[in-house]
Amino acid sequence: MGLLILGIESSCDETGVALVRSIGAARPRLLAHALHSQVQMHQAYGGVVPELASRDHIRRVLPLTTQVLRASGQRLADVDVLAYTRGPGLAGALLVGAGLACALAAALGKPVLGVHHLEGHLLSPFLSADPPEFPFVALLVSGGHTQLMRVDGVGRYALLGETIDDAAGEAFDKSAKLMGLGYPGGPALARLAEQGSATAFGLPRPLLHSGDLDFSFAGLKTAVLTQVRKLGDQLPARKADLAASTEAAIVQVLVKKTLAALRQTGLRRIVVAGGVGANRRLRQQLDAACADSGLRVHYPELALCTDNGAMIALAAAMRLQAGVQQAGTDYAFDVLPRWPLAASA
């Protein structure tokens, strides 16, 4: 029967729970997952309020666990390992998932395992119908992180480049806020961009020709603010064009740096993960560039691009399979709000 692993994600504003079954060296299989997003709750504040996020995780995580067990036809007593997001993320939010996982594990006498949030994103395409093979270059791109990693196997990660200021997702969200598009801004900006011209505004592409694999998006955000102020009363009529131009600037940098990472490493496979990985323009441009060069690009299923419990259960299963980490029965836990991925290997 292999191992039945319950994964809990609570690092920010999504509460996710999932069950994965791992049998021998076979690819782990997702049995069920459930997710609650706090987007509606945080909309009134224009962003995530950490205290409210933690309280909502407390309300949601146990009912979601019950929902997943029922959907999979499993009992809590059948679970072999409990996995949770140890970091990075909001400290209070992380403590909710860690606390529940360790409490359940202690009550059941089962082992527990803390997982790196970004490793969950990085490995999430292994749940897709077209999973990648090692080694590959990973573009981890979300509201809080923008990194390029060389991935030679589970737990074998080398940082190639990262943002020196704002993450790509943050650039989407803050630009959207400047345009009055509400929260969450990234998806709203991407939808509006489909109606506009990507060449209407000559926005900067920071570090595009820097020769390294680092990113910078703070200057782009400032340029968007400048355009918003220049447009004044004309902003409503030009908003779609500004959204399209902003999206095009972010995507061009992401695509060029990712292809440069492939050239630098000599690898021919890309994994794109994180919330921004769902962006249509990013997928279209990467797919086109890879098709022209005979390269392979892999994405998670769209439903698994945002934070979710499935990626945490999967990462735990793959770490156990690879023998890079053992689940333990020391139920004293801590969380790591700041935790470089390479340091978790």
From Swiss-Prot:
<feature type="binding site">
    <location>
        <position position="186"/>
    </location>
    <ligand>
        <name>substrate</name>
    </ligand>
</feature>
<dbReference type="GO" id="GO:0061711">
    <property type="term" value="F:N(6)-L-threonylcarbamoyladenine synthase activity"/>
</dbReference>
<feature type="binding site">
    <location>
        <begin position="140"/>
        <end position="144"/>
    </location>
    <ligand>
        <name>substrate</name>
    </ligand>
</feature>
<feature type="binding site">
    <location>
        <position position="307"/>
    </location>
    <ligand>
        <name>Fe cation</name>
    </ligand>
</feature>
<dbReference type="InterPro" id="IPR043129">
    <property type="entry name" value="ATPase_NBD"/>
</dbReference>
<keyword id="KW-0808">Transferase</keyword>
<feature type="binding site">
    <location>
        <position position="173"/>
    </location>
    <ligand>
        <name>substrate</name>
    </ligand>
</feature>
<feature type="binding site">
    <location>
        <position position="121"/>
    </location>
    <ligand>
        <name>Fe cation</name>
    </ligand>
</feature>
<dbReference type="Pfam" id="PF00814">
    <property type="entry name" value="TsaD"/>
</dbReference>
<keyword id="KW-0012">Acyltransferase</keyword>
<keyword id="KW-0963">Cytoplasm</keyword>
<dbReference type="InterPro" id="IPR000905">
    <property type="entry name" value="Gcp-like_dom"/>
</dbReference>
<comment type="similarity">
    <text>Belongs to the KAE1 / TsaD family.</text>
</comment>
<keyword id="KW-0819">tRNA processing</keyword>
<keyword id="KW-0479">Metal-binding</keyword>
<dbReference type="InterPro" id="IPR017861">
    <property type="entry name" value="KAE1/TsaD"/>
</dbReference>
<dbReference type="InterPro" id="IPR022450">
    <property type="entry name" value="TsaD"/>
</dbReference>
<comment type="function">
    <text>Required for the formation of a threonylcarbamoyl group on adenosine at position 37 (t(6)A37) in tRNAs that read codons beginning with adenine. Is involved in the transfer of the threonylcarbamoyl moiety of threonylcarbamoyl-AMP (TC-AMP) to the N6 group of A37, together with TsaE and TsaB. TsaD likely plays a direct catalytic role in this reaction.</text>
</comment>
<feature type="binding site">
    <location>
        <position position="279"/>
    </location>
    <ligand>
        <name>substrate</name>
    </ligand>
</feature>
<dbReference type="GO" id="GO:0005737">
    <property type="term" value="C:cytoplasm"/>
</dbReference>
<dbReference type="GO" id="GO:0002949">
    <property type="term" value="P:tRNA threonylcarbamoyladenosine modification"/>
</dbReference>
<dbReference type="GO" id="GO:0005506">
    <property type="term" value="F:iron ion binding"/>
</dbReference>
<dbReference type="InterPro" id="IPR017860">
    <property type="entry name" value="Peptidase_M22_CS"/>
</dbReference>
<keyword id="KW-0408">Iron</keyword>
<protein>
    <recommendedName>
        <fullName>tRNA N6-adenosine threonylcarbamoyltransferase</fullName>
        <ecNumber>2.3.1.234</ecNumber>
    </recommendedName>
</protein>
<feature type="binding site">
    <location>
        <position position="117"/>
    </location>
    <ligand>
        <name>Fe cation</name>
    </ligand>
</feature>
